Every structure is written in structure tokens, then in C-alpha cells.
């Protein structure tokens, strides 16, 4: 049976944990050695020493490919966590030294990334000009996955985050967004009833987008089958839909953050649908298990407290709280 060492006598080194991970990734001692720029005998010796110290066999060497034993899988699992903490320690020290300098990686779903984030980033940059900001705009699911994988600091999305990803994240309601039906300025349609929607020529995003799914759910609740809508055109971006509507190709449900100013300036005509209101929540999300740099912490605090850098909410967006 393995005898636990004293607290200050760990039975492994970080180099040994790096070697275990490399062998698991590469499937052989030689390739692991190549990836670490050391000799194969040095890798073998470190593994032998680690197995002797732990009193277990970590790798099955009988096949063509080296495989982890059950004990090896346990060691790999905790090795990943230990090495992750080491990386975060380095990040935290660098962040402490840099103070006002840093890098912030944000994620957003399409509507949020196009119409909400530019205003937020501009205000943040005015307060912290030395912090560089990177914005990734993808679907809600992809953004949530990147948060879980530790590739993003903070994200704001409009769609529902899948439960299997949400349980790894801290998710908070940030704002409410409304969708309105719009047509070209000269559109002859006036205040259509719900049943009239079936006869209108629609321009939409693809069915997999969170925007389309939100609209479809609300229409279903009001007795309108989205599959029966006359979808004249499916496009991949909100701006493309706006251009198509302005060209008179049809009508579209669009977020007020995307068209509110355009409606006010007469570039679109808002068509009030009797008895229909489509609202959705915008979600602020981050990974609580990931080290948050000072740049990310300041961004989060500004959004949550409405202080520091956030002076003016994005136009046509109602912040919650």
C-alpha cells in the first residue's frame, strides 16, 4: 500500500507531471520525449521513478501504443489541474506586475457582438486605454464552449446556454432585448394581426441561430407555426437582413439594438403586431474556475455595478438591476 509522505515531501515533480501528460497525448515514450526536447531514456527514467514513488503502474506498455492504466488516468486528471494552477500562478504574477496593462478576450453571440459590444468596448477602452481587447463573435453554444475551455475571459450572449455547458459557468442576467417587426420605409403593411404574419414575405437568419430560435419559440406560444411562415430569404448576418429589408425584399423580426436608431431616423418602418411582444434576456457569463485577470475583473465589475468605466448603456438596451 502507498505510504503518504509528509506534507513537504511530494512524491512527484512538475517535470514528471509534464512527462505523464506528454506520453498520454503522444501515445509513446519516444514521441513524448521529442515533444519535450529530451531523450527517450530520460523520459523512461522519470516515469520509473514516479511509479516507484507512487507504488503504482501508470502505463500499459504491452501494446503498440502506450496506454494509461486506471492509476495513470487518475494521475493525469490531477496533473492537468496542477499544471493549470501553475499557469494561472504565472498569469497572476504577470498581471500584478503589469497593473494597468493587460489583455482582455471577450466573446459574444452575433447580435450582441455586432451592436452591443462595440459601445461597451469603447467605454472600457476610454477608461483603460493600455488594455488591449479581443472580441470573438460566434454562436451562443460555441462561445459557451470556449468559456468552459478557458479560451475567453468574459462573454455576453443572447441565446440560452446549454445546460451541459452552463453548469460549468457563472451566468447572470444582464439586460433585456426586444424584437420588433420591420419593413422598408415605403412598406404598405400596417399593424398586421398575428394571423396576417403567415402571408408576409419574411427574411430570417438560419434556423440554428439563437435569434431565430427565440422568435420561433414565441410565435409557437402564440399559435403561429414558424414552419408555415413565408420565408423568402435566409441570410447569415443581421446586417445582410437589414439591407434586404431596405431593398424591399420582405419584412423581418430584428432586435431594437440593431434597428432602433434606424426606425427613429426613418430608415425602417416598425410594424406593430397586435398581441405580440418578443423579448429575450442577454446573459453575462464567465468561468469561475479560470483565473480572472485584473483586466477581466474590471470589465465584470463595471457591468455589474454600473460604475467605473460604464457611463452609458448601449442604445435601446435595458440593463437589469
Give short role names for the model-derived ranges.
Residues 1-11, 221, 256-265, 275-321:
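C-terminal effector-binding regulatory domain of bacterial HTH transcription factors
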Residues 21-39:
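Short helix-boundary/capping micro-motifs
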Residues 26, 35, 49-57, 127:
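Residue cluster at the C-terminal edge of the helix-turn-helix DNA-binding motif
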Residues 51-73:
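A short LG(V/I)-centered, amphipathic sequence patch enriched
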Residues 53-54, 75-97, 299, 310-316:
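Alpha-helical linker/hinge and terminal dimerization helices associated
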Residues 101-164, 318-319:
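Central regulatory/effector-binding core of bacterial HTH transcription factors
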Residues 141, 168-247, 261-278, 306-321:
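C-terminal regulatory
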Amino acid at each position: 500500500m502507498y505510504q503518504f509522505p509528509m506534507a513537504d515531501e511530494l512524491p512527484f515533480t512538475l517535470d514528471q507531471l509534464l512527462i505523464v501528460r506528454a506520453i498520454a497525448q503522444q501515445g509513446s515514450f519516444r514521441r513524448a520525449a521529442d515533444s519535450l526536447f529530451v531523450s527517450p531514456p530520460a523520459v523512461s527514467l522519470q516515469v520509473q521513478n514516479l511509479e516507484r514513488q507512487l507504488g503504482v503502474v501508470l502505463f500499459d506498455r504491452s501494446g503498440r501504443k502506450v496506454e494509461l492504466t486506471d492509476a495513470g488516468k487518475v494521475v493525469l486528471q490531477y496533473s492537468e489541474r496542477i499544471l493549470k494552477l501553475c499557469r494561472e500562478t504565472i498569469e497572476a504574477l504577470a498581471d500584478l506586475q503589469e497593473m494597468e496593462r493587460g489583455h482582455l478576450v471577450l466573446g459574444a453571440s452575433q447580435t450582441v457582438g455586432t451592436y452591443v459590444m462595440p459601445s461597451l468596448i469603447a467605454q472600457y477602452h476610454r477608461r483603460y486605454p493600455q488594455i488591449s481587447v479581443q472580441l470573438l463573435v460566434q454562436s451562443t453554444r460555441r462561445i459557451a464552449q470556449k468559456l468552459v475551455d478557458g479560451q475567453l475571459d468574459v462573454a455576453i450572449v443572447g441565446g440560452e446556454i446549454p445546460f451541459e455547458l452552463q453548469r460549468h459557468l457563472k451566468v447572470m442576467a444582464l439586460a433585456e432585448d426586444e424584437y420588433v417587426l420591420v419593413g422598408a420605409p415605403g412598406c404598405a403593411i400596417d399593424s398586421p394581426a398575428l394571423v396576417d404574419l403567415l402571408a408576409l414575405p419574411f427574411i430570417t437568419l438560419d434556423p440554428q441561430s439563437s435569434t431565430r430560435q427565440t422568435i420561433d419559440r414565441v410565435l409557437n406560444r402564440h399559435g403561429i407555426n414558424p414552419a408555415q411562415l413565408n420565408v423568402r430569404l435566409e441570410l447569415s448576418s443581421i446586417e445582410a437582413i437589414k439591407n434586404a429589408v431596405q431593398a424591399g425584399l420582405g419584412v423581418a423580426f430584428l432586435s431594437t439594438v440593431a434597428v432602433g436608431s434606424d426606425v427613429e431616423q426613418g430608415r425602417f418602418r416598425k410594424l406593430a403586431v397586435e398581441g405580440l411582444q418578443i423579448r429575450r434576456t442577454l446573459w453575462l457569463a464567465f468561468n469561475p474556475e479560470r483565473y480572472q485577470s485584473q483586466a477581466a475583473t474590471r470589465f465584470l465589475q463595471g457591468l455589474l455595478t454600473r460604475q467605473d468605466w460604464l457611463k452609458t448603456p448601449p442604445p435601446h438596451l435595458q440593463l437589469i438591476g
